UniProtKB/Swiss-Prot annotation:
InterPro entries: aa-tRNA-synth_I_CS, aa-tRNA-synth_Ia, Anticodon_Ia_Val, M/V/L/I-tRNA-synth_anticd-bd, Rossmann-like_a/b/a_fold, tRNA-bd_arm, tRNAsynth_Ia_anticodon-bd, Val-tRNA_synth_C_sf
Family of the protein in this entry: Belongs to the class-I aminoacyl-tRNA synthetase family. ValS type 1 subfamily.
Function summary: Catalyzes the attachment of valine to tRNA(Val). As ValRS can inadvertently accommodate and process structurally similar amino acids such as threonine, to avoid such errors, it has a 'posttransfer' editing activity that hydrolyzes mischarged Thr-tRNA(Val) in a tRNA-dependent manner.
Subunit description: Monomer.
Source organism of the structure: Janthinobacterium sp. (strain Marseille) (Minibacterium massiliensis)
Protein name in UniProt: Valine--tRNA ligase
Matches recorded under HAMAP family: Val_tRNA_synth_type1
Motif ('KMSKS' region): 559-563
Catalytic activity: tRNA(Val) + L-valine + ATP = L-valyl-tRNA(Val) + AMP + diphosphate
Keyword Repeat: no
Alphabetized GO MF terms: aminoacyl-tRNA deacylase activity; ATP binding; valine-tRNA ligase activity
Keyword Aminoacyl-tRNA synthetase applies: yes
GO BP terms in the entry: valyl-tRNA aminoacylation
Keywords linked to the UniProt accession: Aminoacyl-tRNA synthetase, ATP-binding, Coiled coil, Cytoplasm, Ligase, Nucleotide-binding, Protein biosynthesis
C-alpha cells in the first residue's frame, strides 16, 4: 500500500479509532492464565468538556493500557462519567432560567426528569472527546455514577454504614453556598486574597468597671504608660457576624488582658452579655489580641466553642439574610447590607474605634462566585475516626486508621513518594465528612422520617415502613430531601464497577486495580476516600500504586482557568482553531463579563493566527514528554509543533524505507540467519552499521521498559525521540542509502531487512504513546517483514511489545559507529571552519599510522563520502604539507584537500582571533567584577564562564591554524 506524500492525521484518526472499537480490541477478559492490568478512569463530570488535564492523564492511562495489552495482560481500563450533582443541576437550571422557569416551578420529580433528558442528549460529548484522544478503555464496561447498578451500591453502602454506626445525622458547621442553597465541599470553595477592611470595635465591660491598659513600653518590653479603659477592642473583618458572638477570647499569656478573663462584656447593638475567655487559639501579636468568638459562623470559632462549651447562635438564614436571632433592626437585611448598617450604628454610638484597609482570603463558590458562609445546619456525616464494629474487615479501627496503614505498610505506593506525607497529614487531621447536599440532582438519601422526626434508614420505602412498623409507628413516612455528596458515589467506584456486593469474576480479577493516575488536588477528596471505602467494604486496597501528576499551567506558569481566559481545549490542538473562534470560546459564559475585553486582547496577542492542527499523536507525545513525576507543567504550544515535526519525520522515514524495499528481496526468506550470523557472500551480509542500529535498539527497548516500570513517560518520550530521530533517521537511513547503492546483493538484502525490522519494532515501541500514526504505518510495513497474520486480529495493538535482547548488544559495532560519527562531524566542522559551500564536494585525505588502521579507515570511506559531501576519500601514510586545517579523531588525522589563498585566510583568521580576544576580555571583565558575581543569578554567572571556555577553545584552534599559515 502506497503511503501519502505527507502525514495527514485527521483521516487516519477517524478511521482507526472507529475500527479498533468496532473490532472489540479494547474489551477486557478475565482469562485466569494471563496476568491482570486494570485502571480506573477518574470519571469526568457528565456536564463537562475536556481540558488539558484530561488530555494529560488520559495519555498516561492509555499509554499504560496499550503497553500492558501488547504484553499479553488482561487489560481492563474502566471508563465512566460522574453525575456531578451541583455542576449538572446548575447547567439545567440555567437552561430553565432562559425560559423564565425555576426548578421550584417544575417541582422535584419533573426537574429530575429534565436533568435526565439533558444528560441523555449531551452526556456523550465528553466520552466522544475521550475517543478523540485515542483512548482505548473497555467501553462495554462504561458506567454512570447514577445508573442502576451504581445507585444500588450507593444505597447498600449507606445503609450498612448507618447500621454500623459510622454514618450519623447532626448539626455542624459546613461550607454553605447561599446562592445554590446547599452545603459544598472544600474543593468547590476557591479562596483568593482580596482587598477588604479591618474594623476595631469597642466592647464595653458589662459592670462598667475600668482598668489600666498599657500604651507605651521601654526597650525591655515593660509598660511605661497606661490609660484608663472600660472596654476592650476587638478587631474583625466581618462586623455583621458580631450579632452571633458568644464570647471574646484572649491569649492566656497576654498580660494586657489576663486579669479580665472571666469578666462579662456587653455585646454592642445587642441586649446580651458575653464572657471573656482565654484560649491558645488567639495570637496576641495580631490585631488587638482580642478575638470575637462566633461558633455558628466560623470554623475556628466553632472549635473554640466546643472546647469552652459555648452556645452557637446562628444569625443568618440559608439565603444569607439576618434572621430572627438578631435585633429586629437588622432582621431581613442581606448580610452585606447589614454590615453597612451595623458599622454605621457602631460609629453613631462611639463604639467604632478604627477602620483600616486589610488584605484577606475570601472563600467563594467556584460556580457562583458568591462568598461562602460557614453555616450551622443539620447534615449527614461519615464518622472518620470512630472504630468500626465487630463483623467488619477491620474491627476496632476507624476507616481513617486503615487508610493510613495501607500506605504505611506499602500495600499502596504513592508516586512521587513525597505525596505520602501530604496524604498522612490530611488524614491525621481529618474531620467527619459531611455527605449531604441540599440539591435535587443526585443520589437521594435513603432515609425516611415519621411524623415525630424519627428516622428510618432503609434500602427502599417498603423496608423503611417495615422498620417503622416494628418500632410501633404506622403513619405516613417522608423521605429525606437531601442528596449525597458526589464524592460519596465516586469513592465507591473501585468496587461498584466490578459487581460488588457479589464476588464476580471481574471483582476477583481486577480489584485491586494496578494504578490510579490522578492530580494532587484530589488526593484527599477522592483518593483517600476510595481507600477508606474499598478497604472497609472489601478488605482489599482499591489500587496498588497512585501516580500523582502536577497541574497543567499555561506557558508562563499561570493556573489555567476560565476567568483568566487562558484555557486550552485539547480538541482545538488536535483539529486547529482560528483566532475568532478561540476568542469566542474563551469569552462566553464568564462569571464576570467585564473580563471579556482583556481576555480577547491577550488571546489575539498570543495566537494572532489561531492554533494550528497538530493531530492527536503530536499532542499525546507532548503530554508524555511533560510527564515527569509530580511537577507542575508549564504547557508550551511550540512543543506540539516540534512533535508534529517528529511525526512527519517518522512518516517520511517510512516512505523512504518502503520506496527502497518494496519490490526487492528484503532478506526474509524462510529461516533466514539472524543479524551477525551470516558469512560475507552469504544470503545476507550485515554491516557494522546494521549491527549498530540493532544494538542501539536493544538499549532503547531496555530504557523504555524501565520508563514504563517507573511511570516516567518523559523518559519514554525522550528515548523514542532520540532513537527514532537521531539514530535511525539522521544516521542509519543515511548509512543505509550508501549500503543499498554500493553494497553487494547480500549486503543490500541485509540492509533492507534491517531497515524494515528496526522500523517495524520502532512502530511497536512507540504505539502506546502515538497510536494512530504507528498503526497506519505498521499496516504498510508489517507485510514486508514476513509478518504472519494474527488470528486475534491484524492490528499493531495486538502485537507483542518489543523486549530487549542482551545478546544483540554489539559494543564493537557501537564503537565503529561512534568513530564514523566523530569523523563525519570532524569533516563537517572542517568544512565550516573553511567556509566551504555545502554544494562543493572536496576530497578528504586520512592519515593512518599502520596497515590495520588503514583498513579500518578505508571501511569508513564510502560512508564519509556520502555523509560529509566529499568528492573522494583517500587513506595515506602521511598527510601532505598544506596550510589546510587538520582534525584529529582518535589517532587518525583528517584533512580536506582544498587550495587555500594563504593571505586571505591569514586576514580572516586575524580578524576572528581579534574578535574572540575582545569577547574573552569583555566576559572576564564581568567575572572579575565582584558586584556582578554577587548580584547576578548563579545561572547567568555560569553562562558567562561557559562563554569564556568556549571562546578560549575556539581561539586555540584558530591560533593553531594561523601558526600553520
Amino acid at each position: 500500500m502506497e503511503l501519502a506524500k505527507s502525514f495527514d492525521p485527521a483521516d487516519i484518526e477517524a478511521f482507526w479509532r472507529t475500527e479498533w472499537e468496532k473490532r472489540g480490541y479494547y474489551t477486557a477478559t478475565t482469562d485466569a492464565d494471563k496476568p491482570a492490568f486494570s485502571i480506573q478512569l477518574p470519571p469526568p463530570n457528565v456536564t463537562g468538556t475536556l481540558h488539558l488535564g484530561h488530555g494529560f492523564n488520559q495519555t498516561i492511562m492509555d499509554g499504560l493500557t496499550r503497553y500492558h495489552r501488547m504484553r499479553g495482560f488482561n487489560t481492563a481500563w474502566i471508563p465512566g462519567t460522574d453525575h456531578a450533582g451541583i455542576a449538572t443541576q446548575i447547567v439545567v437550571e440555567r437552561q430553565l432560567d432562559a425560559q423564565k422557569i425555576t426548578r421550584h416551578d417544575l417541582g422535584r420529580e419533573k426537574f429530575v426528569e429534565k436533568v435526565w433528558e439533558w444528560k441523555e442528549k449531551s452526556g456523550s460529548t465528553i466520552t466522544g472527546q475521550i475517543r478523540r484522544l485515542g483512548a482505548s478503555p473497555d467501553w462495554s464496561r462504561e458506567y454512570f455514577t447514577m445508573d442502576e447498578p451504581r445507585s444500588k451500591t450507593v444505597t447498600e453502602v449507606f445503609v450498612r454504614l448507618v447500621e454500623q454506626g459510622l454514618i450519623y445525622r447532626g448539626k455542624r458547621l459546613v461550607n454553605w453556598d447561599p446562592v445554590l442553597g446547599t452545603a459544598v465541599s472544600d474543593l468547590e470553595v476557591v479562596s483568593e486574597e482580596e482587598d477588604g477592611q479591618m474594623w476595631n470595635i469597642r466592647y464595653p465591660l458589662a459592670d462598667g468597671s475600668s482598668y489600666k491598659f498599657p500604651i507605651a513600653f521601654d526597650e525591655a518590653g515593660n509598660a511605661t504608660e497606661w490609660e484608663e479603659r472600660n472596654f476592650i477592642v476587638v478587631a474583625t473583618t466581618r462586623p455583621e457576624t458580631m450579632l452571633g458572638d458568644v464570647a471574646v477570647a484572649v491569649d492566656p499569656t497576654d498580660t494586657r488582658y489576663q486579669h479580665l478573663v472571666g469578666k462579662l462584656l456587653t455585646l454592642p447593638l445587642c441586649e446580651r452579655t458575653i464572657p471573656i475567655i482565654a484560649d491558645d487559639y488567639v495570637d496576641k501579636e495580631f490585631g488587638t489580641g482580642c478575638v470575637k468568638i462566633t461558633p455558628a459562623h466560623d470554623f475556628n470559632d466553632y472549635a473554640v466553642g466546643q472546647r469552652h462549651n459555648l452556645d452557637k447562635i446562628s444569625i443568618l438564614t440559608l439565603d444569607a439574610k439576618i434572621n430572627e436571632n438578631a435585633p429586629a433592626a437588622y432582621q431581613g437585611l442581606d448580610r452585606f447590607a447589614a454590615r453597612k448598617q451595623i458599622v454605621a450604628d457602631l460609629d453613631a454610638q462611639g463604639l467604632l474605634e478604627l477602620v483600616k484597609p486589610h488584605k484577606l482570603m475570601v472563600p467563594r463558590g467556584d460556580r457562583t462566585n458568591t462568598v461562602i458562609e460557614p453555616m450551622l445546619t443539620d447534615q449527614w456525616f461519615v464518622a472518620m475516626s470512630k472504630p468500626a464494629p465487630e463483623g467488619t474487615y477491620f474491627p476496632g479501627k476507624s476507616i481513617t486508621e486503615v487508610a493510613l496503614e495501607k500506605v504505611a505498610n506499602g500495600e499502596i505506593k504513592m508516586l512521587p513518594e513525597n505525596w505520602t506525607n501530604t496524604y498522612n497529614q490530611w488524614l491525621n487531621n481529618i474531620q467527619d465528612w459531611c455527605i449531604s447536599r441540599q440539591l435535587w440532582w443526585g443520589h437521594q438519601i435513603p432515609a425516611w422520617y415519621d411524623s415525630e422526626g424519627k428516622v428510618y434508614v432503609a434500602r427502599n420505602e417498603d423496608e423503611a415502613k417495615a422498620k417503622a412498623t416494628a418500632a410501633g409507628y404506622n403513619g405516613p413516612l417522608t423521605r429525606d430531601e437531601d442528596v449525597l455528596d458526589t464524592w460519596f458515589s465516586s469513592a465507591l467506584v473501585p468496587f461498584s464497577t466490578l459487581g460488588w456486593p457479589e464476588e464476580t469474576p471481574d471483582f476477583k480479577t481486577f480489584l485491586p486495580s494496578s494504578v490510579l493516575v490522578t492530580g494532587f488536588d484530589i488526593i484527599f477528596f477522592w483518593v483517600a476516600r476510595m481507600v477508606m471505602m474499598t478497604t472497609h467494604f472489601t478488605g482489599k486496597v482499591p489500587f496498588k500504586t497512585v501516580y500523582v501528576h502536577g497541574l497543567i499551567r499555561d506557558s508562563s506558569g499561570q493556573k489555567m482557568s476560565k476567568s483568566k481566559g487562558n484555557t486550552l481545549d485539547p480538541i482545538d490542538l488536535i483539529d486547529g482553531i482560528n483566532v475568532d473562534e478561540l476568542v469566542a470560546k474563551r469569552t462566553v459564559g464568564l462569571m464576570n463579563p467585564k473580563q471579556a475585553a482583556s481576555i480577547e486582547k491577550s488571546t489575539r496577542k498570543e495566537f494572532p493566527a489561531g492554533i494550528s492542527a497538530y493531530g492527536t499523536d503530536a499532542l499525546r507525545f507532548t503530554m508524555a514528554s511533560y510527564a515527569s513525576l509530580g511537577r507542575n507543567i508549564n504547557f508550551d504550544l511550540s512543543r506540539c509543533e516540534g512533535y508534529r515535526n517528529f511525526c512527519n519525520k517518522l512518516w517520511n522515514a517510512t516512505r523512504f524505507v518502503l520506496m527502497n524495499c518494496e519490490g526487492h528481496d528484503c532478506g526474509f526468506r524462510d529461516a533466514p540467519c539472524a543479524a551477525g550470523d551470516c558469512d560475507p557472500g552469504g544470503y545476507t551480509d550485515f554491516s557494522q552499521a546494521d549491527r549498530w542500529i540493532v544494538s542501539k535498539l536493544q538499549r532503547t527497548e531496555a530504557d523504555i521498559a524501565k520508563g514504563f516500570a517507573d511511570y516516567r513517560f518523559d523518559n519514554i518520550a525522550a528515548s523514542l525521540y532520540q532513537f527514532i530521530w537521531d539514530e535511525y533517521c539522521d544516521w542509519y537511513l543515511e548509512v543505509a542509502k550508501v549500503q543499498i547503492q554500493t553494497g553487494t546483493e547480500a549486503q543490500q538484502r541485509a540492509t533492507r531487512r534491517t531497515l524494515l525490522r528496526v522500523l517495524e519494532t520502532i512502530l511497536r515501541l512507540a504505539h502506546p504513546v502515538i497510536p494512530f500514526i504507528t498503526e497506519a504505518l505498521w499496516q504498510t510495513v508489517a507485510p514486508l517483514t514476513g509478518y504472519k497474520p494474527n488470528p486475534a486480529g491484524d492490528s499493531i495493538m495486538l502485537q507483542p511489545y518489543p523486549e530487549a535482547q542482551a545478546g544483540k548488544i554489539d559494543e564493537q559495532a557501537e564503537n565503529w559507529m561512534a568513530e564514523l560519527k566523530a569523523m563525519t562531524d570532524a569533516c563537517r566542522n572542517l568544512r565550516g571552519e573553511m567556509q566551504l559551500s555545502p554544494a562543493l564536494r572536496v576530497p578528504l585525505i586520512m592519515e593512518a599510522s599502520d596497515p590495520t588502521q588503514a583498513a579500518r579507515l578505508q571501511s569508513f570511506a564510502p560512508y564519509l563520502q556520502a555523509l560529509a559531501k566529499l568528492s573522494e576519500v583517500n587513506v595515506a601514510d602521511k598527510l601532505p604539507e598544506s596550510p589546510a586545517p587538520v582534525s584529529i579523531v582518535g589517532t587518525a588525522k583528517l584533512m580536506l584537500k582544498v587550495e587555500i589563498d594563504v593571505a586571505a585566510e591569514r586576514e580572516r583568521l586575524s580578524k576572528e582571533i581579534a574578535r574572540l580576544d575582545g569577547e574573552i576580555t569583555k566576559a572576564n571583565s564581568k567575572l572579575g567584577n565582584e558586584s556582578f558575581v554577587a548580584r547576578a543569578p548563579a545561572q547567568v554567572v555560569a553562562q558567562e564562564k561557559e562563554r569564556v571556555a568556549n571562546f578560549s577553545a575556539t581561539l586555540n584552534k584558530l591560533r593553531e591554524q594561523f601558526a600553520k599559515l
